[in-house]
Structures are given as C-alpha cells and as structure tokens.
Amino acid sequence: MAVWLQAGALLVLLVVSSVSTNPGTPQHLCGSHLVDALYLVCGPTGFFYNPKRDVEPLLGFLPPKSAQETEVADFAFKDHAELIRKRGIVEQCCHKPCSIFELQNYCN
C-alpha cells in the first residue's frame, strides 16, 4: 500500500512539473544551447545567422578620413548601432530569458 502511495505522489509531482515547463516559458539560452534550440524550433527551414567578420583588411581600400569626419560619422550611426546591438539574439535570449515564440523570429 505504501508503494502505491509513493508512486501516486511521484506521478502527481511529475505531472505538475511537466505542466509548468510549457513552450512559452522563457529560458536563458547561450552558446551551443542557443544553437540547438534554434535547430529544434526552426527545423529544416534553418535560421538566420550572420557571423561577424573582420573588417580590418577591407579598410585598406578606403581613403583615410580626418578626425572630424570620423567623429561626425560615428555620431550619425551611434543610435542605429546601439539599436542593432540591443536586438541581437544573444541579447534577447542569453542575457535575458526568451521563449520559443521569440526564437521563431530568427527562423528563415
């Protein structure tokens, strides 16, 4: 009788814990966990990934700018660059928790 009581309590505990982990529950996903989650959510359609590349070799093709031109150019795009940085998937899902629904925004 005690075994059935323990088994019943364990079953109730499993049901309650599985209900609380629904797909909409936000989670922190970083590194390989984030990539695995994207593969799982996006499936065969894949997901958008744009790795950063080194732009130093490309800068040699441009004429040098004066200090004043550089300052004006940096100021003009500062807000836009800040917005892009804040909306990245790492900011959205690693630094803060995100849900499966938010991950779907990065699918192709």
Swiss-Prot record:
Quaternary organization: Heterodimer of a B chain and an A chain linked by two disulfide bonds.
Cellular component, GO, one term: extracellular space
Signal peptide, first to last residue: 1-21
UniProt entry keywords in alphabetical sequence: Carbohydrate metabolism, Cleavage on pair of basic residues, Disulfide bond, Glucose metabolism, Hormone, Secreted, Signal
Domain of life according to the entry: Eukaryota
Disulfide bonds: 30-94, 42-107, 93-98
Species in which this protein is naturally found: Danio rerio (Zebrafish)
InterPro entries tied to this protein: Insulin, Insulin-like, Insulin-like_sf, Insulin_CS, Insulin_family
Protein name per UniProt: Insulin
UniProt-annotated location(s): Secreted
One function term, GO molecular function aspect: hormone activity
GO biological process annotation, one example: response to glucose
Keyword Lipid metabolism (UniProt): no
Taxonomy of the source species: Eukaryota, Metazoa, Chordata, Craniata, Vertebrata
Propeptide: 54-84
Any matching Pfam family: Insulin
The protein's role, per its UniProt record: Insulin decreases blood glucose concentration. It increases cell permeability to monosaccharides, amino acids and fatty acids. It accelerates glycolysis, the pentose phosphate cycle, and glycogen synthesis in liver.
Keyword Secreted (UniProt): yes
Family named by the database record: Belongs to the insulin family.
CDD domains from the UniProt entry: IlGF_insulin_like
